Structures are given as structure tokens and as C-alpha cells.
């Protein structure tokens, strides 16, 4: 059985766009760079050729990864999400119980997480601690930097 990869429509669209770019723009550019480097003669000491081949290997590896991710994607329509319990797609407002610092996070797929933008991976310690909880609940997050306690203030959708 193939594991589905949950993600938002926005995250899925970004993966599709990167895949299109790598296949239709980056791949031809690298092939051209390899051909140009080959034209310079001796390949054994041709740094341009080796750099282009390395770029090709990296690009093709990422293309394979993106094809796999998009094939296994489970796109979750956040406009149809609701309820008081926290699950994938929820935007959660928390207060750090030690510092009273307020944080707002949206729970998203692994590929679209960006902590600076307030998007955390569903598999992160804090998201795992929040799943199934509601506003008013307290959670304890055990992370590599130590343990932190938060109170959930609000759960929003969309």
C-alpha cells in the first residue's frame, strides 16, 4: 500500500509548478550545458562538463521525488474543513504558558511547512501534540530543545 501525502491545494500547486519547471525549463538548459561542455573536448578534465552532469543528476533526482509526491498527494480542501477539534489544515492560536508569547500556526503537509510563515508540518512535535485538542486545552510539547507548555486559544479554518 502506498502512503498518501496530505497537503493543501496551494502546496500541491507549488509541487506541480516546480515539477513543470524542472522538466520543461531546467532539464533542457542542463542538456544544452552538457552539449556545450562536450564540445570543449577532453571530458576527463572538463569541469564544466562534470558540473553540468552533477546538476543533471540533482535535477533528475528531484524530478523523481516530485513525481512520487504528486502521485501520492492527498489534496485536502480546507474550505470544507470545520469543527472545534484541531486537525490537518487548522490555524491554531496558542499562548506559551511560560512567556505569554502568542503564536499562530497552520498545520500543513511536510512539503509545505515554513515555520517563519506560520506553517508547521503535521508530523512536527507541536502539531502532533495539538491534533484532536480544542480551544481551552493545554498541551505539552517535547522537542529536542526541551519541553514547552502551551494553551490553545482558538482554532480557525480557511
UniProtKB/Swiss-Prot annotation:
GO terms for molecular function: DNA binding; RNA polymerase binding. It comes from the Bacteria. Keywords: DNA-binding, Transcription, Transcription regulation. One of its GO terms (biological process) is DNA-templated transcription elongation. Transmembrane segments: none annotated. Pfam families: GreA_GreB, GreA_GreB_N. HAMAP family: GreA_GreB. Necessary for efficient RNA polymerase transcription elongation past template-encoded arresting sites. The arresting sites in DNA have the property of trapping a certain fraction of elongating RNA polymerases that pass through, resulting in locked ternary complexes. Cleavage of the nascent transcript by cleavage factors such as GreA or GreB allows the resumption of elongation from the new 3'terminus. GreA releases sequences of 2 to 3 nucleotides. Belongs to the GreA/GreB family. This is Transcription elongation factor GreA. It comes from Allorhizobium ampelinum (strain ATCC BAA-846 / DSM 112012 / S4).
Amino acid at each position: 500500500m502506498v502512503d498518501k501525502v496530505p497537503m493543501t491545494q496551494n502546496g500541491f500547486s507549488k509541487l506541480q509548478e516546480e515539477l513543470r519547471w524542472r522538466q520543461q525549463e531546467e532539464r533542457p538548459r542542463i542538456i544544452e550545458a552538457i552539449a556545450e561542455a562536450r564540445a570543449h573536448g577532453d571530458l576527463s578534465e572538463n569541469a564544466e562538463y562534470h558540473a553540468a552532469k552533477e546538476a543533471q543528476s540533482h535535477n533528475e533526482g528531484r524530478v523523481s521525488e516530485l513525481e512520487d509526491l504528486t502521485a501520492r498527494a492527498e489534496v485536502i480542501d480546507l474550505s470544507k474543513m470545520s469543527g472545534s477539534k484541531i486537525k490537518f489544515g487548522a490555524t491554531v492560536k496558542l499562548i506559551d504558558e511560560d512567556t505569554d508569547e502568542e503564536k499562530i500556526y497552520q498545520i500543513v503537509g511536510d512539503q509545505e511547512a515554513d515555520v517563519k510563515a506560520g506553517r508547521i508540518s503535521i508530523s512536527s512535535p507541536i502539531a502532533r501534540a495539538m491534533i484532536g485538542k480544542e480551544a481551552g486545552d493545554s498541551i505539552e510539547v517535547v522537542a529536542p530543545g526541551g519541553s514547552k507548555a502551551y494553551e490553545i486559544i482558538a482554532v480557525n479554518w480557511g
